[in-house]
Amino acid sequence: DERRRCLGADRGGCPPGRSASPLEAEAEADDPVPVGRAPWNPLLDLHRRAQGRAGAREQAIARYGFAVPNDEALDLIVAWSPEGVVELGAGVGYLARLLADRGVDVVAYDKDPPPSATNRWFAGREPWHPVLPGDEGVVGEQTQRTLLIVWPTRDETWPADAVEAFHHAGGGRLVYVGEGPGGRSGDDRFHALLGGIPRCLACTYGVADAVCTCGAPVLWRRERTVELPQWHGYTDRAEAYTATRQPAPAGRRPSRLPWRRRRL
Protein backbone atom coordinates (compact mmCIF):
# COMPACT_ATOMS: atom_id res chain seq x y z
CA ASP A 1 0.00 0.00 0.00
CA GLU A 2 1.14 3.53 -0.73
CA ARG A 3 2.21 5.25 2.49
CA ARG A 4 0.09 8.19 3.65
CA ARG A 5 1.67 11.56 3.07
CA CYS A 6 2.70 13.29 6.30
CA LEU A 7 0.82 16.45 7.23
CA GLY A 8 2.87 19.40 6.07
CA ALA A 9 5.30 17.31 4.02
CA ASP A 10 5.19 19.81 1.17
CA ARG A 11 6.14 22.59 3.62
CA GLY A 12 9.15 20.90 5.15
CA GLY A 13 7.85 17.47 5.83
CA CYS A 14 7.96 14.51 8.16
CA PRO A 15 11.00 13.19 9.90
CA PRO A 16 12.64 10.47 7.78
CA GLY A 17 10.66 7.28 7.66
CA ARG A 18 7.51 8.55 9.38
CA SER A 19 4.07 8.16 7.87
CA ALA A 20 0.97 10.15 8.69
CA SER A 21 -1.65 9.13 11.22
CA PRO A 22 -5.31 9.04 10.13
CA LEU A 23 -5.91 12.35 11.93
CA GLU A 24 -2.96 13.92 10.12
CA ALA A 25 -4.07 12.58 6.76
CA GLU A 26 -7.54 14.07 7.24
CA ALA A 27 -6.16 17.43 8.30
CA GLU A 28 -3.88 17.51 5.25
CA ALA A 29 -6.71 16.53 2.91
CA ASP A 30 -8.98 19.45 3.79
CA ASP A 31 -6.37 22.01 4.85
CA PRO A 32 -7.76 25.34 3.55
CA VAL A 33 -4.41 27.16 3.85
CA PRO A 34 -2.56 27.24 0.51
CA VAL A 35 0.94 25.85 0.57
CA GLY A 36 3.47 28.57 1.33
CA ARG A 37 0.88 31.02 2.67
CA ALA A 38 1.26 30.21 6.38
CA PRO A 39 4.14 29.14 8.63
CA TRP A 40 4.50 25.39 8.88
CA ASN A 41 2.84 24.14 12.09
CA PRO A 42 0.96 20.88 11.49
CA LEU A 43 0.26 20.32 15.19
CA LEU A 44 -1.78 23.52 15.35
CA ASP A 45 -3.83 22.34 12.37
CA LEU A 46 -4.25 18.90 13.93
CA HIS A 47 -5.36 20.37 17.26
CA ARG A 48 -8.02 22.50 15.56
CA ARG A 49 -9.55 19.49 13.83
CA ALA A 50 -9.09 16.79 16.44
CA GLN A 51 -10.51 18.34 19.64
CA GLY A 52 -12.82 15.89 21.36
CA ARG A 53 -11.67 12.83 19.45
CA ALA A 54 -10.65 9.87 21.57
CA GLY A 55 -6.89 9.48 21.74
CA ALA A 56 -6.17 12.68 19.81
CA ARG A 57 -3.95 14.21 22.49
CA GLU A 58 -1.96 11.01 22.94
CA GLN A 59 -1.36 10.75 19.18
CA ALA A 60 -0.30 14.39 19.03
CA ILE A 61 2.12 13.97 21.95
CA ALA A 62 3.75 10.92 20.40
CA ARG A 63 4.42 12.73 17.11
CA TYR A 64 5.00 16.33 18.15
CA GLY A 65 5.05 16.98 21.90
CA PHE A 66 2.90 18.03 24.84
CA ALA A 67 2.33 21.72 24.05
CA VAL A 68 0.45 23.15 21.05
CA PRO A 69 2.39 26.29 20.09
CA ASN A 70 0.52 29.09 18.35
CA ASP A 71 1.93 32.17 16.62
CA GLU A 72 1.62 34.29 19.77
CA ALA A 73 3.68 31.83 21.84
CA LEU A 74 6.28 31.46 19.10
CA ASP A 75 6.53 35.24 18.75
CA LEU A 76 7.07 35.50 22.51
CA ILE A 77 9.90 32.96 22.48
CA VAL A 78 11.52 34.59 19.46
CA ALA A 79 11.38 38.03 21.10
CA TRP A 80 12.74 36.60 24.38
CA SER A 81 15.69 34.89 22.67
CA PRO A 82 17.93 37.52 21.05
CA GLU A 83 21.00 35.28 21.50
CA GLY A 84 19.30 32.00 20.66
CA VAL A 85 17.69 29.17 22.64
CA VAL A 86 18.97 26.21 24.62
CA GLU A 87 16.10 23.76 25.07
CA LEU A 88 16.29 21.06 27.73
CA GLY A 89 14.04 18.02 27.56
CA ALA A 90 13.38 18.74 23.88
CA GLY A 91 11.72 15.43 23.01
CA VAL A 92 11.33 15.10 19.25
CA GLY A 93 12.43 18.70 18.73
CA TYR A 94 9.17 19.94 17.22
CA LEU A 95 9.20 23.31 18.97
CA ALA A 96 12.91 23.65 18.22
CA ARG A 97 12.10 23.12 14.54
CA LEU A 98 9.39 25.81 14.58
CA LEU A 99 11.78 28.28 16.21
CA ALA A 100 14.59 27.44 13.79
CA ASP A 101 12.18 28.05 10.90
CA ARG A 102 11.70 31.55 12.35
CA GLY A 103 15.42 32.25 12.38
CA VAL A 104 16.24 31.39 16.00
CA ASP A 105 19.55 29.64 16.70
CA VAL A 106 18.39 26.61 18.70
CA VAL A 107 20.48 24.01 20.51
CA ALA A 108 18.20 21.22 21.75
CA TYR A 109 19.05 18.58 24.36
CA ASP A 110 17.31 15.58 25.85
CA LYS A 111 18.62 13.04 28.34
CA ASP A 112 17.50 10.27 25.99
CA PRO A 113 17.18 11.80 22.52
CA PRO A 114 14.72 10.03 20.24
CA PRO A 115 14.64 7.55 18.66
CA SER A 116 16.33 6.10 21.77
CA ALA A 117 14.41 3.15 23.20
CA THR A 118 14.98 4.56 26.69
CA ASN A 119 12.87 7.65 25.98
CA ARG A 120 9.54 6.76 27.56
CA TRP A 121 7.53 9.20 25.43
CA PHE A 122 9.24 9.23 22.05
CA ALA A 123 11.00 5.88 21.66
CA GLY A 124 11.41 5.04 17.97
CA ARG A 125 10.46 8.53 16.75
CA GLU A 126 12.75 10.45 14.43
CA PRO A 127 13.26 14.06 15.60
CA TRP A 128 12.05 17.10 13.69
CA HIS A 129 15.21 18.99 14.68
CA PRO A 130 18.62 17.70 15.82
CA VAL A 131 18.43 16.77 19.51
CA LEU A 132 21.71 16.23 21.36
CA PRO A 133 22.20 14.05 24.44
CA GLY A 134 22.38 16.23 27.54
CA ASP A 135 20.86 16.90 30.95
CA GLU A 136 20.74 19.88 33.30
CA GLY A 137 24.54 19.89 33.42
CA VAL A 138 24.78 21.48 29.96
CA VAL A 139 22.87 24.69 30.67
CA GLY A 140 25.70 26.39 32.53
CA GLU A 141 27.66 26.51 29.27
CA GLN A 142 24.85 28.27 27.37
CA THR A 143 24.02 31.25 29.56
CA GLN A 144 23.94 33.75 26.69
CA ARG A 145 20.94 31.87 25.31
CA THR A 146 17.39 31.72 26.62
CA LEU A 147 16.63 28.52 28.51
CA LEU A 148 13.48 26.84 27.17
CA ILE A 149 11.75 24.12 29.18
CA VAL A 150 8.51 22.63 27.87
CA TRP A 151 6.28 20.36 29.97
CA PRO A 152 9.05 19.13 32.30
CA THR A 153 8.34 15.90 34.13
CA ARG A 154 6.58 16.35 37.46
CA ASP A 155 8.18 13.44 39.32
CA GLU A 156 11.85 14.27 38.68
CA THR A 157 14.21 16.93 40.04
CA TRP A 158 16.01 17.89 36.82
CA PRO A 159 13.70 20.82 35.90
CA ALA A 160 14.36 22.58 39.22
CA ASP A 161 18.05 21.70 39.06
CA ALA A 162 18.23 23.16 35.53
CA VAL A 163 16.64 26.55 36.27
CA GLU A 164 18.72 26.86 39.44
CA ALA A 165 22.01 25.95 37.71
CA PHE A 166 21.24 28.27 34.80
CA HIS A 167 20.55 31.16 37.18
CA HIS A 168 23.69 30.55 39.24
CA ALA A 169 25.82 30.38 36.08
CA GLY A 170 24.58 33.81 35.01
CA GLY A 171 21.70 32.95 32.69
CA GLY A 172 19.20 35.78 32.44
CA ARG A 173 16.20 34.62 30.40
CA LEU A 174 13.87 31.66 30.73
CA VAL A 175 10.75 30.49 28.91
CA TYR A 176 8.60 27.87 30.61
CA VAL A 177 5.75 26.14 28.79
CA GLY A 178 3.46 24.00 30.91
CA GLU A 179 0.90 24.09 33.70
CA GLY A 180 1.11 26.12 36.89
CA PRO A 181 1.77 24.95 40.46
CA GLY A 182 -0.16 21.78 41.28
CA GLY A 183 -0.44 20.93 37.60
CA ARG A 184 1.04 18.10 35.61
CA SER A 185 4.42 19.61 34.75
CA GLY A 186 7.31 20.52 37.04
CA ASP A 187 7.57 19.63 40.73
CA ASP A 188 6.93 21.93 43.69
CA ARG A 189 10.55 23.06 43.97
CA PHE A 190 10.60 24.01 40.30
CA HIS A 191 7.54 26.21 40.73
CA ALA A 192 8.89 27.66 43.98
CA LEU A 193 12.05 28.80 42.20
CA LEU A 194 9.81 30.47 39.61
CA GLY A 195 7.86 32.25 42.34
CA GLY A 196 4.69 30.22 41.97
CA ILE A 197 4.56 28.68 45.46
CA PRO A 198 4.56 31.22 48.31
CA ARG A 199 5.09 28.71 51.14
CA CYS A 200 6.34 25.15 51.62
CA LEU A 201 3.22 23.03 51.22
CA ALA A 202 4.80 19.87 52.63
CA CYS A 203 5.67 21.51 55.95
CA THR A 204 2.93 24.14 56.23
CA TYR A 205 -0.02 21.97 55.25
CA GLY A 206 1.33 18.42 55.48
CA VAL A 207 0.63 17.69 51.81
CA ALA A 208 1.88 14.13 51.54
CA ASP A 209 3.10 14.16 47.93
CA ALA A 210 4.55 17.68 48.01
CA VAL A 211 8.29 18.31 47.83
CA CYS A 212 9.74 20.33 50.71
CA THR A 213 10.56 23.80 49.40
CA CYS A 214 11.69 25.36 52.69
CA GLY A 215 14.29 27.98 51.96
CA ALA A 216 13.89 27.79 48.18
CA PRO A 217 14.56 31.31 46.88
CA VAL A 218 12.56 32.95 44.11
CA LEU A 219 15.17 33.05 41.34
CA TRP A 220 12.95 34.09 38.43
CA ARG A 221 10.42 36.87 37.84
CA ARG A 222 7.59 36.30 35.38
CA GLU A 223 7.32 39.09 32.82
CA ARG A 224 4.84 37.86 30.20
CA THR A 225 2.28 35.10 29.74
CA VAL A 226 0.70 33.80 26.54
CA GLU A 227 -2.23 31.39 26.51
CA LEU A 228 -1.89 28.32 24.30
CA PRO A 229 -4.41 26.23 22.40
CA GLN A 230 -5.24 23.63 25.03
CA TRP A 231 -6.44 20.07 25.02
CA HIS A 232 -9.63 19.55 27.02
CA GLY A 233 -8.92 19.58 30.74
CA TYR A 234 -5.41 21.03 30.47
CA THR A 235 -4.24 24.53 31.35
CA ASP A 236 -0.76 24.98 29.90
CA ARG A 237 0.63 28.34 28.81
CA ALA A 238 3.91 29.99 27.81
CA GLU A 239 5.62 32.19 30.38
CA ALA A 240 8.69 34.41 29.93
CA TYR A 241 10.96 35.11 32.92
CA THR A 242 13.98 37.20 33.79
CA ALA A 243 16.50 36.27 36.48
CA THR A 244 16.34 37.97 39.86
CA ARG A 245 19.85 38.82 41.04
CA GLN A 246 18.73 39.38 44.63
CA PRO A 247 16.56 36.28 45.15
CA ALA A 248 13.46 36.89 47.23
CA PRO A 249 12.70 34.59 50.19
CA ALA A 250 9.58 32.48 50.36
CA GLY A 251 6.45 34.53 51.04
CA ARG A 252 4.04 34.48 53.93
CA ARG A 253 1.70 31.66 54.61
CA PRO A 254 -1.41 31.91 52.38
CA SER A 255 -4.83 31.52 53.94
CA ARG A 256 -5.71 28.46 51.85
CA LEU A 257 -4.23 26.11 49.30
CA PRO A 258 -4.00 28.03 46.01
CA TRP A 259 -4.64 24.95 43.87
CA ARG A 260 -5.44 21.27 43.84
CA ARG A 261 -3.06 18.71 42.45
CA ARG A 262 -4.14 17.17 39.13
CA ARG A 263 -3.37 13.87 37.46
CA LEU A 264 -1.31 13.61 34.29
Feature locations, PLM:
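S-adenosyl-L-methionine
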Residues: 1-81, 112, 116-142
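Conserved class I S-adenosyl-L-methionine
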Residues: 82-91
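Glycine-rich SAM-binding Motif I of class I
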Residues: 93-97
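Conserved SAM-binding motif I beta-strand of class I
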Residues: 105-110
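A short SAM/SAH-binding and catalytic strip from SAM-dependent methyltransferases
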Residues: 145-157
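C-terminal substrate-binding/active-site "lid" region of AdoMet-derived donor-dependent transferases
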Residues: 154-226
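Rossmann-like AdoMet/SAM-dependent catalytic core
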Residues: 207-251
